[in-house]
Amino acid sequence: MNTSISSTNSGTYRGVRAAAGAAGRREPVGEAVEELCAAVFTSLRRRDQRERGRQYVRGLLAAQGRKSIRNIAQQLTAGAGAGGAAAAEQSLHHFIAASTWDWQPIRAALSQYLGGTAPLNAWVAQPMAIPKGGEHSVGAGHRFDPHRGQMFRGQQAFGTWFTSAGVVTPVGWRLHLREEQEAADESYEECAVTAVLDTLREARESGAATRPVVLDVRDIATRAALNRFAEARVPVVGRISPEARLLVTDPRLPGFGAGTLAARDVLQNVRGLRMPVEWPDPELPGARRTSLVAAVRVMVPDPAPGRRREVLLFGEWEAARRLPTQLWVTDMVRTEPGALVRMTKTAHRVSAAAGASVQDVGLRDFSGRSLPGWHRHVTLASVAHAARCLAPAAAPVAASVPVRHSPLHRPRAHAAVLAGR
């Protein structure tokens, strides 16, 4: 007898409900899943696809350990026996790896939904290394991770994160493929920039406002990357290499007329202009930190004179007598440096959120050679991550417990949105 996931509802899910009740589990995340899935799965034309997506999201949140399709299927069919779990696994595998549904509209709908919870402060682009031991995962291989400065074996992905006053969650992804695979001529930098611009294009088409991008990828703010953001008319703040060559444009400042200088030297020459900037510690709610910050207008050398333009180089010192620890450039040259430094701290919020919850929703757990399958998995894992962020209180979610539909608790809107560019 062929047992589908939906056919196990009446018997199996009563067992899951009883087990959940015995464990004293609450369901705020489950309520968030129901409302969020109803909002973001509208592009799935068939009802069974929408139901399968909802079950997959619940399974990601409920399954213990690695969030493999097999583990999710076993969680969904607890008590149904080996036959029911095997049928569920086959059905889920087809839904993720062999189906034809498009993940991009779901990502766009997720961005739109999140924008309704609180004003978007900034997009943050960060790399995500995915260790993989075997050869059976798309894009896996021996790689150098510039963000961490070390070799590893696995996949390299780039995530684009939505950040507001109360929500930090990923909405877009791109996988950097090895040479023998599709898009083999795409560099690490090109992949990172394309990842965020693709996400922003989808968000814009869904009505999202243009907000700055924080490129939290080591040494990413090259001339080519900055030009791509300028062409897309997206304001950007990006990390820059201390050795990157820049031209000082202010005749009153040291280094003017001296040709190109290393970014670190430009900042060291103006360290007398440093000012203290206070910022909230994203890892310690209520705590505040102070850094020394200096900013100077510079030009990124470009062989095409028409594309030469001023950007603002700013650096952050954690200790007065040492070199700057963070170097950034931005095209928002009229924005106050303190506001820019505080904006870069959203990247710390993303790092903290990624470290705490990426494993909980299985963003790194897809195994298989299917690139569309990888995209579908990380898209649904992003929905699961968003549900955890939006729930009134984090709590385990049972894979199949029916929940009552009720309005989500929505974070309060951020009182002050960064103004000016």
What function would you assign to each model-found segment?
Residues 91, 147-210, 324-326:
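Electropositive, glycine- and tryptophan-enriched low-complexity nucleic-acid-binding patches
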Residues 2-36, 40-49, 253-301, 359-367, ...:
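A short, flexible helix-boundary coil/loop motif
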Residues 334-368:
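Short amphipathic alpha-helical "interface-anchor" segments enriched in bulky aromatics
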Residues 173, 237-241, 246-346:
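An anionic, glycine-rich sequence signature occurring as long contiguous blocks
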